[in-house]
């Protein structure tokens, strides 16, 4: 028999395996050792935020997505935009019934667009099962009525980045543990032209990640456990009174107009002493050590530490930002979109991206707590927990 020909039995066996792969997605692909037969020329469009760790977007474009294209036999186009523009893009796409197949979200945004997305529990549960389960926060924001309306992707930790030498000069050899202590040291530093620089503008990340824990630490809340609006309370009023004075005493008052990049630039330029942020400030100082210097000419990276938000009268709180991906209902390639998210979420494919983040993002599952990366740099350890 001609070695280049196959008989009917061989053809049925191979074609059957390929069909099973198409039905079973990534797991089927691995089992059949060939990609599913998606229509020739299929293109998948994906929108994500422009990452604060540029190396991660580069990795996606140049390495991970090209590998996914080969595995899935499809073209994948990635668009990265300012996270503040994502929600308007989602709204326009749903109203026009056309747009990206996959869109990244933050917080609980997907609940606003639930009627316009596909249920993705088949993908999410496979990732969770293989990696120790999702964090409660990641699962909660991605589900509605017990169903996954988005696939959890990551969690960006928020800590206060601060100039350890500047605080030490004012007697704070450890970061303040209460709002009163933070206000006192901040007031001294502002008098020297080194204010706290807190983002408080209408923006997606740092401002809400500061404001909510601050409010909670005073006993305030937007809603109670039954969903009743309870913002108008004595505790909320007390938090506002303190913050008004704290802002004038210790902050760069221009922060009311800052977005999530203004405080990064202010810190790295030596204009502020502290700010709530992801680890992107420190990571950028590592990336360009000779560009970012202290007033003494030393590399900025040597003078940065991270701390949790101070505690208030009702305790200490934190909010870390969960990221997810939605598969859009108007999309014509929903199965392929799910296969891509499963491919990206599997441990062997997610790990290179996780490493490129250098601790800026952690995985949505408990698996990544055990990763050796946390032994690489003690300055990043606060983001592990």
Explain the meaning of each model-derived region.
Residues 2-19:
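N-terminal secretory signal peptides and thylakoid transit peptides that target proteins
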Residues 43-61, 81, 156, 205:
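Extracytoplasmic "Venus flytrap"
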Residues 66-134, 143, 165-177, 264-266, ...:
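Extracytoplasmic "Venus flytrap"/periplasmic binding protein-like
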Residues 121-134, 202, 218-240, 287-302, ...:
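Short, solvent-exposed loop/beta-turn-alpha elements that line the ligand-binding surface or hinge
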Residues 185-189, 227-257, 305, 309:
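Glycine-centered hinge/linker elements that transmit conformational signals in sensory
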């Amino acid at each position: 028999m001609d070695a280049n020909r196959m008989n009917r039995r061989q053809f049925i066996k191979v074609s059957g395996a390929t069909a099973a792969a198409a039905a079973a997605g990534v797991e089927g692909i691995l089992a059949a050792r060939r990609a599913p037969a998606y229509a020739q020329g299929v293109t998948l469009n994906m929108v994500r935020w422009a990452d604060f760790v540029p190396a991660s977007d580069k990795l996606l474009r140049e390495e991970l997505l090209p590998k996914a294209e080969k595995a899935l036999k499809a073209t994948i186009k990635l668009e990265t935009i300012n996270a503040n523009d994502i929600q308007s893009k989602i709204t326009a796409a749903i109203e026009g019934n056309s747009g990206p197949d996959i869109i990244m979200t933050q917080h609980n945004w997907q609940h606003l667009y639930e009627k316009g997305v596909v249920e993705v529990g088949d993908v999410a549960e496979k990732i969770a099962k293989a990696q120790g389960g999702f964090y409660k926060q990641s699962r909660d924001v991605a589900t509605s009525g017990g169903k996954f309306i988005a696939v959890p992707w990551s969690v960006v930790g928020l800590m206060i980045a601060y100039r350890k030498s500047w605080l030490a000069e004012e007697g704070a050899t450890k970061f303040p543990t209460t709002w009163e202590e933070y206000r006192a040291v901040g007031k001294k530093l502002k008098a020297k032209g080194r204010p706290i620089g807190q983002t408080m503008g209408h923006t997606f990340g740092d401002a809400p990640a500061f404001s909510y824990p601050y409010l909670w630490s005073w006993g305030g809340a937007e809603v109670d456990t039954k969903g009743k609006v309870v913002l108008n309370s004595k505790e909320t009023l007390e938090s506002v009174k303190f913050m008004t004075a704290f802002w004038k005493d210790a902050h760069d008052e221009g922060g009311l107009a800052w977005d999530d990049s203004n405080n990064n630039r202010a810190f790295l330029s030596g204009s502020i002493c502290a700010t709530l942020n992801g680890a992107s400030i420190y990571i950028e100082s590592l990336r360009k050590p000779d560009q970012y210097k202290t007033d003494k000419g030393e590399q900025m990276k040597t003078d940065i530490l991270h701390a949790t938000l101070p505690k208030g009268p009702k305790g200490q709180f934190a909010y870390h930002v969960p990221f997810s991906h939605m598969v859009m209902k108007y999309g014509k390639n929903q199965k392929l979109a799910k296969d891509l998210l499963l491919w990206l979420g599997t441990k062997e494919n997610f790990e290179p991206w996780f490493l490129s983040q250098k601790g800026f993002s952690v995985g949505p599952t408990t698996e990544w707590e055990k990763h050796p990366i946390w032994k690489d740099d003690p300055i990043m350890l606060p983001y592990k927990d």
